[in-house]
Amino acid sequence: MSTVGSTVSSTPSRRFKHRNVNTFLTYSRCPLEPEAVGLHIWSLIAHWTPVYVLSVRETHEDGGYHIHVLAQSAKPVYTTDSGFFDIDGFHPNIQSAKSANKVRAYAMKNPVTYWERGTFIPRKTSFLGDSTEPNSKKQSKDDIVRDIIEHSTNKQEYLSMIQKALPYEWATKLQYFEYSANKLFPDIQEIYTSPFPQSTPALLDPTAINTWLENNLYQVSPSAYMLANPSCLTLEEATSDLIWMHETSRTLIPTGSSACTSSGQQEQASPPGPGAWEDIITGRTTSTGPPTTRTQNTTSSTTYPSSTVHAGSN
């Protein structure tokens, strides 16, 4: 049976730390056989010399199965990998079973079937401080919360463990625990992946962009064209005009005359000044261009010789 540690919930966290000779695991909604789970845990902690492993199947309220595992070893099992105890994609709730007696009694309260190996070693130190046991010392709230922070692997598990260990504080200070949960286990932001393949140069799907331009910027409906052109009276005429404009606007039309390449320079015209003003008054015209032949229309008129007319009678 392989150990899977690649799921989101089992990603190694720098905050996670487990170190204890008694390990209590709960696999929620796990259909695996207790024997297979127990054998896997036994081989998994072989480095720390296992002495007892109990694997119990329990029926949940929704009809599914839970697996509880109590693992005891001669040396403390130490790991900072929250996915260390994962089995075939199933991630357990991991706790330090400081009161092995209570944990074993809890796991065996209503078993469907179970598997165990080795010799159970009773422990008298209670995780929450059991006053019924002799020489027991009640654990402080700081120690309880510290242990929860070290063993929780996600936000939901952290709040659930707080609720079980400190119910009054959970009910009266839930907003503070939720804040600390968000800080301990921040949401992982998804990396954006473009749906379009990379191109050269790196453009984003020019075909889709061109289609958008055609439908939004370069398209005019016949009805809108008729409103802008009152002389267009029918939809057929408007459609015909739009088709013509569409084809014409995408066809290079020759200008009809080539660009001038002559290096000759025109003479610079004289700027207006006193001389020009005098010409305007006297009626003279100053030519600023090349000489031209001007034809002046003349009309015949009767001229009289210059003579002295004496008034009077002979």
Curated annotation (Swiss-Prot):
Cofactor: Mg(2+); Mn(2+)
Bias (Polar residues) ranges: 255-269
Entry GO CC: host cell cytoplasm; host cell nucleus
Skewed-composition ranges (Low complexity): 282-308
Motif (RCR-1) on chain: 24-27
Region (Disordered): 255-314
Lyase is among the record's keywords: no
UniProt region (Oligomerization), positions on chain: 180-192
Binding site for a divalent metal cation: E58, H66, H68, N110
Cofactor binding note: Divalent metal cations, possibly Mg(2+) or Mn(2+).
Protein localization: Host nucleus; Host cytoplasm
Motif (RCR-3): 106-109
EC top class, as a word: hydrolase
GO MF, any single term: structural molecule activity
InterPro entries given in the database record: CRESS_DNA_REP, Gemini_AL1_MSV, Gemini_AL1_REP, Gemini_AL1_REP_central
Record text about domains: There are 3 rolling circle replication (RCR) motifs. RCR-2 may be involved in metal coordination. RCR-3 is required for phosphodiester bond cleavage for initiation of RCR.
Function: Implicated in enhancement of V-sense gene expression. Acts a an inhibitor of C-sense gene transcription.
Assembly notes: Homooligomer. Part of the C- and V-complexes which are RepA-Rep-DNA complexes involved in the c-sense and v-sense transcription.
Record protein name field: Replication-associated protein A
Organism of derivation: Sugarcane streak virus (isolate South Africa)
